[in-house]
């Protein structure tokens, strides 16, 4: 049974007509969410108060969800395997290269319909960092469209037209890091202690050097190391990717609450699938490579529980470029669901090897060694993406 106190905090902010269905969802998902979050943050003295505040926030986002999206939630919750249809066909593009703007993409919907597309992944279109921004993967604001590509109103129009055409829009949700000009980073630079605690900041090289002994490097040639000295912070900030991308401190429950809310606000704008970027890096632990830690899976399962409560029509897609044997963990299990979809990166790479060498040996070996998946989860088998073939 759900905790009455936390459930009541969510239900209290809902209109009367939305409460019965919300209460039904809470019966299943709230105990799961509480258990996962207690495992991550339960040792904090303020855990119960924090959890109550989180549930109230979720209730407000539930209430703000547009009626047409709530109807989609009901439809898909009644058919939880809707996305396992063998006719699901995806298309991936940069907005600027496919229509030039969100409005331009909307004008190309008839073309997508001709192709039989049911899933459109548009690479980052939220407001990015000024200057270098890793192709949009250094996000300044989760609540604003990149002005070069359109407006929030344009995004709403696009998602509405896509939904009418039976096409689900997928957006990247970069949850490992934000740009160094994101509002949280700016507040941290200005001396706000709560904002500073949202990042991994070290006063000297002692802890960074200890971590570096076991960490890999993502871009050793152009961005060596995993820590960047930031004068305004008076310390070293964890930057797994580029120096201007600050890793979020997911051991801080305020980060979980802020990122969950940001994701749900985007869901309420009509995003139906989230590509969760760099999921393997979410949790840091000294003495390891800080990848694939158990807590990273707890975080993803908690986000899944939140989606199941507020927006069950939404899918979560794991981007975890790890060995094939480690990938199923990001889909969870029937008893403990995590993401709905995961990239099968090894299959993609093996496909190109087969094409280049005119030999299917590697491809057949990858298929043979691909582990089974939970019943309500699937691979995203893809031909190419914006990253290298690996």
State where each predicted segment sits.
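Residue-level signal for helical boundary/lining positions with a hydrophobic bias
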Residues: 168, 273, 381-384
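Active-site-proximal substrate-binding groove within the catalytic cores of carbohydrate-active enzymes
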Residues: 366-390
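Generic recognition of flexible, low-complexity loop/linker segments
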Residues: 79-80, 262, 305, 368-370, ...
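Acidic/aromatic-lined carbohydrate-recognition and catalytic surfaces
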Residues: 1-251, 256-257, 264, 268, ...
């Amino acid at each position: 049974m759900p905790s009455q106190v936390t459930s009541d905090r969510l239900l209290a902010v809902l209109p009367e007509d939305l409460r019965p269905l919300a209460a039904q969802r809470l019966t299943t998902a709230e105990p799961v969410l509480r258990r996962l979050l207690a495992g991550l943050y339960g040792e904090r003295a303020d855990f119960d108060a924090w959890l109550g505040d989180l549930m109230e926030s979720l209730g407000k986002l539930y209430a703000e969800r547009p009626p047409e999206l709530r109807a989609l939630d009901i439809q898909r919750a009644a058919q939880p395997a809707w996305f396992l249809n063998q006719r699901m066909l995806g298309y991936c593009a940069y907005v600027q290269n496919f229509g030039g703007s969100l409005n331009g993409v909307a004008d190309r919907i008839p073309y997508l319909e001709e192709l039989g597309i049911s899933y459109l992944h548009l690479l980052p279109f939220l407001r990015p960092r000024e200057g270098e921004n890793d192709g949009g993967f250094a996000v300044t604001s989760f609540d604003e469209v990149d002005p070069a590509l359109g407006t929030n109103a344009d995004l709403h129009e696009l998602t509405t037209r896509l939904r009418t055409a039976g096409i689900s829009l997928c957006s990247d949700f970069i949850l490992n890091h934000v740009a160094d000009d994101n509002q949280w980073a700016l507040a941290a630079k200005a001396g706000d202690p709560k904002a500073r605690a949202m990042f991994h900041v070290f006063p000297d090289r002692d802890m960074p050097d200890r971590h570096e002994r076991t960490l890999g490097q993502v871009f050793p040639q152009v961005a060596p190391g995993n820590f960047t000295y930031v004068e305004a912070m008076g310390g070293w900030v964890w930057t797994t990717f580029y120096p201007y991308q600050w890793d979020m401190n997911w051991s801080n429950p305020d980060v979980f609450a802020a990122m969950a809310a940001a994701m749900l606000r985007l869901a309420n704008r009509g995003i139906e699938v989230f590509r969760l970027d760099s999921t393997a890096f979410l949790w840091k632990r000294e003495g390891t490579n800080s990848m694939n830690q158990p807590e990273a899976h707890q975080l993803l399962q908690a986000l899944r529980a939140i989606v199941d409560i507020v927006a069950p029509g939404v899918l979560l897609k794991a981007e975890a470029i790890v060995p094939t044997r480690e990938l199923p963990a990001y889909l969870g299990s029937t008893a403990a669901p995590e993401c709905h979809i995961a990239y099968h990166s090894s299959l993609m790479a093996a496909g190109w090897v087969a094409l280049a060498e005119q030999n299917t040996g590697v491809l057949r070996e990858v298929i043979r060694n691909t582990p089974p998946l939970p019943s309500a989860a699937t691979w995203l088998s893809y031909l190419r993406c914006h990253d290298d073939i690996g």
